[in-house]
Amino acid sequence: MIIRSPEPEVKILVDRDPIKTSFEEWAKPGHFSRTIAKGPDTTTWIWNLHADAHDFDSHTNDLEEISRKVFSAHFGQLSIIFLWLSGMYFHGARFSNYEAWLSDPTHIRPSAQVVWPIVGQEILNGDVGGGFRGIQITSGFFQIWRASGITNELQLYCTAIGALVFAALMLFAGWFHYHKAAPKLAWFQDVESMLNHHLTGLLGLGSLSWAGHQIHVSLPINQFLNAAVDPKEIPLPHEFILNRDLLAQLYPSFAEGATPFFTLNWSKYGEFLTFRGGLDPVTGGLWLTDIIHHHLAIAILFLIAGHMYRTNWGIGHSIKDILEAHKGPFTGQGHKGLYEILTTSWHAQLSINLAMLGSLTIVVAHHMYSMPPYPYLATDYGTQLSLFTHHMWIGGFLIVGAAAHAAIFMVRDYDPTIRYNDLLDRVLRHRDAIISHLNWVCIFLGFHSFGLYIHNDTMSALGRPQDMFSDTAIQLQPIFAQWIQNTHALAPGTTAPGAATSTSLTWGGENLVAVGGKVALLPIPLGTADFLVHHIHAFTIHVTVLILLKGVLFARSSRLIPDKANLGFRFPCDGPGRGGTCQVSAWDHVFLGLFWMYNSISVVIFHFSWKMQSDVWGSISDQGIVTHITGGNFAQSSITINGWLRDFLWAQASQVIQSYGSSLSAYGLFFLGAHFVWAFSLMFLFSGRGYWQELIESIVWAHNKLKVAPATQPRALSIVQGRAVGVTHYLLGGIATTWAFFLARIIAVG
């Protein structure tokens, strides 16, 4: 008889068929809430329906059920993303001039949308070159497609169909993992396993497979394209993958296969894994071989990182242990208890992730122009401006979202009775010191940064240019920024001996890369004008942080309202009996923070747009003389408020204002319409609820008189709803106005 040790029990981490699939239930509006499901008595019902549909906390208190809903919703989100991507690729296949652009990217502009002639709007189809008429696009898809080795429209069709299949698969997964096999709470809380799988699978294997694609497909195809080979003559991707000899003709080391890898003779791979720095002079993009090297290195890092956490094998890190060991001399219990917070409050988790992702998105915005990753991206000024602006806005919204969910965590999930002397508790206990100091910093930055401009406007108005802060009078050079630029420019040969050139041309030096007579990138000079506007950036960012952080730290209580936690995340005022307690809820801080986020990002994208047109973008003559779009006027014009209004806003708005009758006229209409949407927001922001309720009751009286009164009783928007509608139109109108202004300008002159 063989005596075996008992088999370890396999944990069952899913529930089978927990919730039945019922179209009848889903067809009933508000089925998730007993109150809303009763149907409308007043028009407030439709607002509550929208406010609570995705607020899973309000449907149930069961953390497992909430987790499953969030998990399922993520698949729905992925499905929409695949659907959107499919649409982009389909447009590229069906309505674009991609193949023409590929053959001549310096003279032909990308277009993937053709307007139908219905009421004469075919005027919007501009001549983008190569005999194609359509709307010029600025999304950067053409550049991405070229970089990844797509050479014809059939490949785009296939990818579009593939994305549709994935969209359907994601929808199925969302249904399956909620209705058929729903994970248990323990599965959502198993952070070590999650880290291992996400780091290894998504980031590690994802980067590795991308590096593989770039080596075997993108690199040879781009090599041929750069040598001006007709795309139709280039072998197809599968030929490079299946036939090693083809690659070996371009890169001889391929003939040796994996031998150099296993014999540690890695320098053999130096042909396609490089460390050049700078830009490829043919395309104005980063060297593809540098990008491949980067992805391979990232893959190795994350494959290692994805094996660091302790799961069934009893080796590796435990997150709880790491957090609890994290104590400093001044931090009391340190991170003790943080593990419990982050595994039971998805708002806390989401808040951190949004803050990180928002910051990362802004980092991406800055790298897209300083290290343009795709071929012919740097000379497509419209796309450069669009990508910067887009990523800045997205980053701003994500960071405000981080504060919103941090505050929701404080109100709904934070339990002060079990938190004592840990890091969060200590921050909350000296929140007055934090907020009052931050307030002082905001006042200091505001008066000094704005004061420098006011000084310049005054001196300029009085005809005393010699007394202004400028590069030609009283200089305020950004010496620290210049030192950083210089350090990076000199890095090759000193701190980075392996690199041929510095990471970005913007750092300085003599280099200039021009493609097809247009500047791709050159060293960006920083002077007094940049010093001034950078302090405006510091000011607006600090005020945004002040508002958002105050909202988080005072979300549960304050001297004014000690029992704020009982009032919830959003409330208009503390009851009718207490005056002066309006706009104190955590939600109101998010509301106010959004306006300052809008201020911050607006100044950043204005700075970028003007600086690049003035000091970087332009044409280069055969003699090597660069002519910038606005002729280098940033340094002298942007040092006064008047200069910003006159030489940036007014001077550069001429293209959008004069666009009627041209292919840019849609931007003129959008410019007008978006101004209207923005102005419409003020109606919601400047008037009180009572005004509208009074008006509505008068209108209802008239309907009753005519016997056409509706069964659902009309109600004015609540105070919070009015603010929500107001801020939405304010931001939407403002962003769309800026979008029309930027694009009409840069498409006309770029």
UniProtKB/Swiss-Prot annotation:
Keywords: 4Fe-4S, Chlorophyll, Chloroplast, Chromophore, Electron transport, Iron, Iron-sulfur, Magnesium, Membrane, Metal-binding, Oxidoreductase, Photosynthesis, Photosystem I, Plastid, Thylakoid, Transmembrane, Transmembrane helix, Transport. It catalyses: reduced [plastocyanin] + hnu + oxidized [2Fe-2S]-[ferredoxin] = oxidized [plastocyanin] + reduced [2Fe-2S]-[ferredoxin]. It holds the Pfam family PsaA_PsaB. This is Photosystem I P700 chlorophyll a apoprotein A1. The gene is psaA. The keyword Thylakoid applies. P700 is a chlorophyll a/chlorophyll a' dimer, A0 is one or more chlorophyll a, A1 is one or both phylloquinones and FX is a shared 4Fe-4S iron-sulfur center. One of its GO terms (cellular component) is chloroplast thylakoid membrane. Its EC number is 1.97.1.12. The PsaA/B heterodimer binds the P700 chlorophyll special pair and subsequent electron acceptors. PSI consists of a core antenna complex that captures photons, and an electron transfer chain that converts photonic excitation into a charge separation. The eukaryotic PSI reaction center is composed of at least 11 subunits. One of its GO terms (biological process) is photosynthesis. It is a multi-pass membrane protein. Phylloquinone binds at residue 692.
